[in-house]
Regions:
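Short, hydrophobic secondary-structure boundary micro-motifs
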Residues: 26-27, 108-109
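Terminal helix-turn-helix DNA-binding modules in bacterial transcription factors
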Residues: 48-87, 109-113
Length: 113
């Protein structure tokens, strides 16, 4: 019973992220208000079930969406950054490069080459 509740909460959290990843202010606190849980408990549970932190998951979702936009649009990097929830293009580029080992601009070049 408790297992099902936990899985349901994680599912809801993931769905919430999918629907709100564009919001730069999306935080653990925001999602916990939605789920009526304490941030500490939610964070522990999320990591236990998914094997990653909530922030790592949110970052992954945002970067996957960015990759889709880089592949499917001609939007400038700063536009894509904003569309996936990053207010600062430089920070977006930093996070992207840390994850993929290449800048968003170079990534696009390798895909369209």
């Amino acid at each position: 019973e408790r297992d099902n509740t936990t899985k349901k909460v994680i599912l809801e959290a993931r769905r919430y992220v999918e629907n709100h990843y564009q919001d730069p202010s999306l935080s653990v606190e925001m999602i916990c208000r939605e789920l009526h849980m304490s941030p500490a408990y939610f964070s522990t549970m999320f990591r236990k079930v998914t094997g990653q932190t909530y922030i790592a998951y949110l970052t992954e979702v945002r970067l996957q969406k960015a990759v889709e936009l880089l592949n499917e649009t001609d939007d400038k990097t700063y536009v894509i950054a904003q569309k996936v929830g990053y207010q600062e293009q430089n920070y977006f580029s930093y996070v992207f490069k840390k994850r993929f080992g290449i800048s968003p601009t170079k990534y696009r070049g390798t895909q369209n080459g």
